[in-house]
């Protein structure tokens, strides 16, 4: 049976107005302080996520600022079938969604102490290249046992995303 080609369709009219999921403060701290805060607040930081934070391309902003975030299913961005990360980025750009700084994932994990078991979502960001040369982005999840997790997941061209997956992205200022 032949595989269907990944597709996206134009977003429905008016979909550029997304509700604010969270207003999040980013910047004003070190990588070490961020990881310590996650550990202290009971958020498991996966090995890959720790490696991503340690990379030179993960740079917390020097001064604080607030960004507005939206959270939607990929289908809201016009995704109708399984797609690659580059397709997700294109669909997001078409509706005005903005990539967030990598540190937003860790800061968001700190803001969700009551994240419900089974809740999980991707972060729309520029990938961080791992030690293996593969691109990775952050993924936040609350395991079925209630453990909150900040994870790194590869987004190479072989990974596919289905329309029901959720993503958090920035809203224009």
What name fits each language-model region?
Residues 1-173:
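A binding-site-centric feature that preferentially detects glycan-recognition modules on secreted/surface proteins
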């Amino acid at each position: 049976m032949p595989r269907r080609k990944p597709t996206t369709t134009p977003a429905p009219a008016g979909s550029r107005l997304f509700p604010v999921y969270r207003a999040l403060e980013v910047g004003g701290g070190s990588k070490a302080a961020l990881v310590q805060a996650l550990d202290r607040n009971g958020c498991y930081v996966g090995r890959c996520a720790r490696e991503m934070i340690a990379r030179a391309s993960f740079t917390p902003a020097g001064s604080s600022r607030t960004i507005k975030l939206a959270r939607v299913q990929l289908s809201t961005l016009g995704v109708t079938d399984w797609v690659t990360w580059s397709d997700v980025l294109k669909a997001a750009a078409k509706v005005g969604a903005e990539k967030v700084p990598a540190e937003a994932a860790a800061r968001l994990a700190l803001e969700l102490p009551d994240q419900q078991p089974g809740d999980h979502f991707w972060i729309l960001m520029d990938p961080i290249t791992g030690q293996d040369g593969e691109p990775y982005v952050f993924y936040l999840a609350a395991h079925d046992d209630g453990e909150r997790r900040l994870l790194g997941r590869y987004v190479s061209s072989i990974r596919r995303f289905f329309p029901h997956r959720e993503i958090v992205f920035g809203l224009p200022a």
